Amino acid sequence: IKAYVRGTSQQMIWQSYYILKETLNYEIPKVVVLNVNAMRYGKDSDEVSEAYNRLTIDNMKWSKEKIEIIKESMTEEETFLSYVFPILRYHSRYDKLTKEDFEYLFKSKTNTYNGFLINKNIKPVENLPTKRTLASYEFPSECYYYLDKITKLCRENNIKLVLIKAPSLYPYWYEEYDENIKKYAQKNQIEYHILIEHIDDIGIE
């Protein structure tokens, strides 16, 4: 099966939309699998950060979609120009710049690992924070807005959209969250698979 992973750590739902939109400039897949975990995080969430924004955005090619994703994702402390000219992000170290900083400013070798350390070590979970009651289990409206746009984009391109909740123990995926997605999937006739229920089958320890 030919497949591509366009996801990154802590990728927000609006970022998934623009990355999908960019992908369709190069390839029309038969199926798009979307992890719905980010539906819990709105634009005012503490989980939105420059570090994760850059992990998602910096390696994208320059395009209309990259401009759009930057504008939608920037925190109040960020500037658009710092994405165009990354050197501006590190202006405080101007006196420490070397030849290599300029040599790789607009070109760099492909780094398929993007900072990840690949290993097979297993560290069992010892303690989990207590599951707390939330004031609301509703997803932010902007998350539904972009999920609608993803759904529409897939339909317009005759792509089958499959929603999943990837296995995770924490942060908790509440039953109420699950019901929200089930209702959305049923209303829009989309497959939804909660893989948390199949952790043993998948082989996650």
Functional labels for PLM-detected ranges:
Residues 151-174:
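Active-site segments of SGNH/GDSL-like serine hydrolases
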Residues 10-14, 138-143, 169-176:
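Acidic-and-aromatic substrate-binding clefts and catalytic sites of carbohydrate-active enzymes
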Residues 1-68:
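Membrane-embedded segments
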Residues 40-44, 93, 170-173:
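Short catalytic/ligand-binding loop motif for oxyanion handling, primarily in non-cytosolic enzymes
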Residues 6-8, 35-37, 164-168, 195-198:
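Active-site-proximal beta-strand/loop segments in catalytic clefts of secreted hydrolases
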Residues 49-157:
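Secreted/periplasmic serine-hydrolase-like ester/acetyl group-modifying domain
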Residues 175-205:
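C-terminal regions of proteins
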Residues 2, 28-31, 155-162, 190-191:
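Loop/turn elements at helix/coil->beta-strand transitions in domains of secreted/extracellular proteins
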